[in-house]
Design a protein with these regions (language model features):
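Conserved hydrophobic/amphipathic secondary-structure segments
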Residues: 1-176, 241-249
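Active-site acidic-Proline motif in GNAT/NAT acetyltransferases
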Residues: 45, 182-183
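An extracytoplasmic/periplasmic, membrane-proximal ligand-sensing/linker region
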Residues: 129, 133-134, 156-158, 174, ...
Length: 251
């Protein structure tokens, strides 16, 4: 049995993306996801924006890559909660954006997965760090960030429509690193693989080794991933069209 490992964005792309991907993610059988990726917006502490509400009245210059989460999340928030993120698009990936933030070429960024950036750049955060987290672009949020009082961007929606648009787009981050098998794989084998997947993801020794490698494990089981994907693909054409519009930068 072949097992596929993809990014969560590849599941959403056929529905709302601009590229012509010819597959139906809803047909596959999902074993689970290694991560529930909570994406965040960040700002340098010396920037004029100290909290997400400030970004609704004060411009924040953010770094972004073309057709990436760093661009999409900032654009989405500009449309749905009326932030004033001014995107500097053209950075070739997340590392150049991080370097630009450190050099103060840009004042912040959106579309960074907290479980990853907190591991790779732990010195950025905390009382002596140079960065602050403005908001979580996620439906539920990361427990540690919730405990710190970091708000969810969706909570600043002024209408149900704005909230629904964000929720549909943000939902794909719940399955950040999904694993899948083909539609024809027998159900009993899928069930066995799902159990084995979660047993691995929750094994204490595996988690220790993952942390040594700088990987954060926050697994989501197969049935939940399957349910979420089914819900996304059951969205109305009207809502999907609104999400597409919200991902289009202003001219």
């Amino acid at each position: 049995t072949w097992i596929g490992a993809i990014f969560g964005g590849a599941i959403l792309e056929p529905l709302i993306g601009t590229t012509k991907i010819h597959h139906d993610p809803n047909r596959f059988q999902y074993l689970g996801s290694a991560n529930d990726d909570v994406y965040v917006c960040l700002a340098r502490k010396d920037a004029p924006v100290k909290k997400i509400e400030d970004a609704m009245t004060t411009e924040l210059i953010v770094g972004a890559s073309m057709a990436s989460s760093s661009a999409d999340f900032a654009t989405m928030l500009n449309h749905e909660i009326h932030t004033k993120f001014r995107e500097v698009v053209g950075y070739n990936g997340s590392r150049p954006i991080m370097l630009a933030m450190e050099k103060n070429e840009v004042q912040g960024a959106c579309g960074f997965a907290w479980p990853s950036i907190n591991v790779t750049n732990p010195n950025w955060f905390g009382p002596e760090g140079m960065m602050r987290v403005l908001a979580q672009t996620h439906v539920k949020g990361y427990p540690a960030l919730n405990a710190m009082g970091i708000p969810l961007a969706r909570d600043f929606a002024k209408t149900d429509e704005e909230r629904e648009v964000m929720d549909l787009y943000f939902s794909h981050t719940t399955f950040g690193r999904p694993y899948l098998v083909a539609p024809e794989v027998p159900k009993d084998r899928v069930e066995a693989l799902r159990k084995a997947f979660m047993a691995t993801m929750t094994d204490p020794e595996f988690i220790i080794e993952a942390k040594k490698a700088g990987l954060d494990i926050d697994a989501v089981d197969g049935p939940e991933v399957q349910r979420l994907i089914g819900k996304i693909y059951a969205a109305s054409p009207d809502l999907i069209a609104k999400v597409k519009r919200a991902l289009q930068p202003d001219p």
